């Protein structure tokens, strides 16, 4: 294997992808804590698992190697000291010592096998799991209506966000919301210690210790030389600028970063919830991200006179900016919901724009977004529909649920 990570486009034939099968963390959602854990509803676990399995099998049927985050994480933690270090960091970042002694919870977690340990950390630790005899501090014995010592991580099935493959390296991301911060720790340990990746010295273009947030749903690889990044509710302009400088100074293939400002709201959480690439010259778009005349704030970042300087060019037309950076004379923006004010809002809420391209002109979408799917087919796109009644409750689509590890070049 020359490069364990290789992604130079959004549409190159998908060869290897990272998923996370929804687990106990979904059943640990309750109405009182939905907002805190970034959910709007509670999926039904048996059905969301069936739907996710269908999604994974759909990818396998097209020749894609499917890896699972939970399996890789367990395989990475073979060393005893490494396990302890990982648990220490999870507990510290999860602020678990507020209601229980760090050592008490650490000993409980380390009593499990690697596979069970990862599932337990992802699923959360309820207070009633720790025996009363183990609680030796007054604050551990206090009645508290909050049910968890360690919060569940229900957003983990959206593997796109904690890390993003960029060329032969990746970003391991500082997540904006506290509920998701721990998620990228799994990828840090997988890249450093899993035998599939550890021996290759994979470049980390931006790591999770950088103080400003960036999330993978905002990172789109347009081609070998150009990436687009959303300036969104979850990704800051400062992180984009730092990533651009790192890329320009540490490698020579990516020459342009397109920063695309989108409205900062939950419905438009990441760039890929409102804009995705489906073919060489075709993109989906949610019309509501554009102004009355199609105006937007777009900035083309290029290398400046030195490593800490950028050349920044402002553009106001997404269509023209894409033509410029991709070297195209024409391209097509396909509106989510056909541009109908009701259908576009409804289907965007259920991730009608969040397509996963598995080859040029071939995409995986949710079956429920029939207006958008019909329009994609009318534009010559092969649309592979997957089940979505429960998966869509997390406000993420096929692109959100997948982290491409390897794609063929286009």
From Swiss-Prot:
Q: Which GO terms describe its cellular component?
A: cytoplasm
Pathway it works in: Amino-acid degradation; L-arginine degradation via ADI pathway; carbamoyl phosphate from L-arginine: step 1/2
Q: What InterPro entries does this protein map onto?
A: Arg_deiminase
Entry's family note: Belongs to the arginine deiminase family.
* Active site (UniProt): 400
Q: Which reaction does it catalyse?
A: L-arginine + H2O = L-citrulline + NH4(+)
Question: What keywords are annotated for this sequence in UniProt?
Answer: Arginine metabolism, Cytoplasm, Hydrolase
Pfam families, alphabetically? ADI
Q: Name one GO molecular function term.
A: arginine deiminase activity
Cellular localization per UniProt: Cytoplasm
Query: What gene name does this entry carry?
Result: arcA
GO annotation terms (biological process): arginine catabolic process to ornithine; arginine deiminase pathway
The record's EC number reads 3.5.3.6
Q: Which residues, by range, are in coiled-coil regions?
A: none
How is this protein named in the record? Arginine deiminase
Give the matching SUPFAM superfamilies. Answer: Pentein
């Amino acid at each position: 294997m020359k490069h364990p990570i290789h992604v130079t486009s959004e549409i190159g034939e998908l060869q290897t992808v990272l998923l996370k099968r929804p687990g106990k963390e979904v059943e640990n959602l309750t109405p009182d804590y939905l907002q805190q854990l970034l959910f709007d509803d509670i999926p039904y676990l048996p059905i969301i698992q069936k739907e996710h399995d269908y999604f994974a099998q759909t990818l396998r049927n097209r020749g894609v190697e499917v890896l699972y985050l939970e399996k890789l994480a367990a395989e990475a933690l073979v060393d005893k000291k490494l396990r302890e270090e990982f648990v220490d960091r999870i507990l510290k970042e999860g602020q678990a010592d507020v209601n229980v002694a760090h050592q008490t919870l650490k000993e409980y977690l380390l009593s499990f096998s690697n596979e069970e340990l990862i599932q337990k950390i992802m699923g959360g630790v309820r207070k009633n799991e720790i025996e009363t005899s183990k609680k030796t501090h007054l604050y551990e014995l206090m009645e508290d209506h909050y049910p968890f010592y360690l919060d569940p991580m229900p957003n983990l099935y959206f593997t796109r966000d904690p890390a993003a493959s960029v060329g032969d390296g990746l970003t391991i991301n500082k997540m904006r919301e506290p509920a998701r911060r721990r998620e990228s720790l799994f990828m840090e340990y997988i890249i450093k210690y899993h035998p599939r990746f550890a021996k290759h010295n994979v470049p980390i273009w931006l790591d999770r210790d950088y103080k400003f947030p960036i999330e993978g749903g905002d990172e789109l690889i347009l081609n070998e030389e150009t990436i687009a990044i959303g300036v969104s509710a979850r990704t800051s302009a400062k992180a984009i600028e730092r990533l651009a400088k790192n890329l320009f100074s540490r490698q020579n293939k990516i020459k342009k970063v397109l920063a695309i400002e989108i409205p900062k709201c939950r419905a438009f959480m990441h760039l890929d919830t409102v804009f995705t690439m489906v073919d060489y010259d075709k993109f989906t778009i949610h019309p509501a991200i554009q102004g009355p005349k199609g105006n937007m704030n777009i900035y083309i970042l290029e290398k400046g006179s030195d490593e800490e300087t950028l050349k920044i060019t402002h553009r106001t037309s997404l269509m023209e900016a894409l033509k410029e950076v991709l070297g195209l004379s024409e391209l097509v923006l396909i509106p989510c919901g056909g541009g109908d004010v009701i259908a576009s809002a409804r289907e965007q809420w259920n991730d009608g724009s969040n397509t996963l391209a598995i080859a040029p002109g071939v995409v995986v979408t949710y079956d429920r977004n029939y207006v958008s799917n019909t329009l994609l087919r009318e534009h010559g796109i092969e649309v592979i529909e997957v089940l979505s009644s429960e998966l869509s409750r997390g406000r993420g689509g096929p692109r959100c649920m997948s982290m491409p590890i390897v794609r063929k070049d286009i």
